[in-house]
Amino acid sequence: MDKKMFCFQCEQTVGCTGCTGNAGVCGKKADTAKLQDELTGALISLANAVDGTETISKRTGQIIIEGLFTTVTNVSFDNAAIENMIQKVRAEKERLVPDCSKCQDPYSSTEEYDLQQLWNANEDIRSLKSLILFGIRGMAAYAYHANVLNYEDAEVNQFFCEALSKIGYEESTESLLSTVLKTGEINLKCMALLDKANTETYGTPEPTDVTLTVEKGPFIVVTGHDLKDLQLLLEQTEGKGINIYTHGEMLPAHAYPFLKKYAHLKGNFGTAWQNQQKEFDHLPAPILYTTNCLMPPKSSYADRVFTTEVVAFPGAVHIDEKKDFTPLIEKALELGGYKEDQTFSGINGGKKVTTGFGHAAILSHAGTVVEAVKAGAIRHFFLVAGCDGAKPGRNYYTEFVKQTPSDSIVLTLACGKFRFNDLDLGEIGGLPRLMDMGQCNDAYGAIQVAVALADAFGCSVNELPLSFVLSWYEQKAVCILLTLLHLGIKNIRLGPSLPAFLSPNILNFLVENYGIAPITTPEEDIKALMNQ
C-alpha cells in the first residue's frame, strides 16, 4: 500500500513505527502532514541561506522559531495557515539571498530539501537527524514563549540554523551525535531564558492551592502554555462578570503573583489534553487554545473553540496578533456558563490540586531538605514528569506515585501530573511529599534543584538518591530528554513506549552509555531505582 503520509514524531504513532494512512493518530490529515514536511524543507533552505550570511537577525530567528513551532504535534491542523507559513519562510530566504539560485554551493541553493530524503535515509542517520529535528521543534516552543515576552538569546537562534543545516546535509554519524547532545545543551539555555522571562515578568511562583470547582455564571477556559495570552485575557475580562479557568498546562499560572492578583482567575477545569473531547463536550463556555495540545473538536463544542498564535484549526475563530478577545468574551456571555456551581474532581477523586513548587520555592527550604536526608527522614527523590497521552499503560505513573515509599519525595511537572496531582501523599518535615514544579519547560527548575542538592552533598547528580521516571508524547519531551543526556544524567526510566524514531543501534548506544530503560511495572521499577 502506498504511503499517503509519514510521521512518527509522537509517542502514539501507529504500531510504534509511523502514521502512513489518510490521517495520523493525532488527527492531522495526510495533506497537512505533507505541508509540514514542505515547511520543514523550506526552513532547512532558509537556514542554509543564513549560514551563508553567518549571523542570524532577530527577524529571521523569529520566523524560524515560528515555523518550527507550527510543526509540533497538535498545534496546527489548518492547511491554509501552514501554507502561509511556508510562503513567509520562502520570502525571508529570498530577502536574504535573492541571487542564491546562481550559486553551486549546496548550502545556499534555492532548491528546497525534500524530507523524503530523511524518511528514506539509513536508519541510524534517520534516527539521529530525527532526534535533532524533533528536539529543535520542541525547543522552538520554548523560544517562542520567551520571544512573546521580549526575551531572546542569539546563541539559541543561531543554533536553530546550525541544526537545520545538519539535518539537511550532514551524513557523519559522529557529527550528528555531537549535534544531538548540543541540542540538549542549547535547550538548557533556552529553558533558562524562558524561566527568566516568566519570573521577571510575572514574579516567582509560590505554592498555591487551586480549586476544581467552577462557579456559576459565564466563564472561559484557557489551555496551553502561553502566560502572556492569559494575562491579556484577564485584563480584557476584568469587571465583566466572566471568570477564567485554566486547563492542562496552564494550571501553573495560578502560582505567579502577577496573575494571582486577578480575582476572576478562579481555578482549574479538567485534566490533561487527551481528555478534552470528553471534558469539553457541551461545555457552556468557550475555550482559548494558546498552544498545543489541540485535538480536532467534536461538533458539540466546535463553535466554542478559539485559537491564537500558531495554533489553528479549520473553522475555528482565530484571535490575531492584535489580541482583541471580544469574540471570545461575547461567546462566554452568550453561553452563560453553568446555572449553579459545579464541583469537579481530579482523576483520583481529589477536589483541589496544588502547584507552584518551582526551584526557588523548593530551594528556599534547602536546609530543611538536606537535614531531612541526613536524618533519614527523606530516603529518595523521584521526578515523575512529562507528557500525558491516550495510549493504554499510562496508569503506570499513577500507580508508581501511589506506591512510592512514605520516606520519599515526588517532584512532578508537565501535564503527566494530572494522573496523580490530586493525591494526598502527606508530608515530611512540613513539606508535601508531592510537589508540582510547573509546566514542561520547568524541567529547568528540576535540574536546578538536582544540581543544588548535589552541591550540598558534595556529589554528582547521578550519585544522589534521585530517580527520573519520565513519560513522553511530543517534541518538547524530546528536547528535555536531550538536555538530561547532555548533562550526563543516567538510568532514566522512559515510557509508556520508546520512540519509534530510535533505531536499534541508536537505542543501544543510549542504553549502554546512559542506562536509559523502558518502564516495566511500578513495583519492579521502584525496587530497582531505590537500590541503585
Regions found by a protein language model. Give the residues of each.
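Electropositive, gly/pro-rich neighborhoods at or near active sites that engage anionic ligands
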Residues: 43-201
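Anaerobic metallocofactor- and corrinoid-dependent redox/one-carbon enzyme cores
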Residues: 2-32, 36-37, 41-45, 54-55, ...
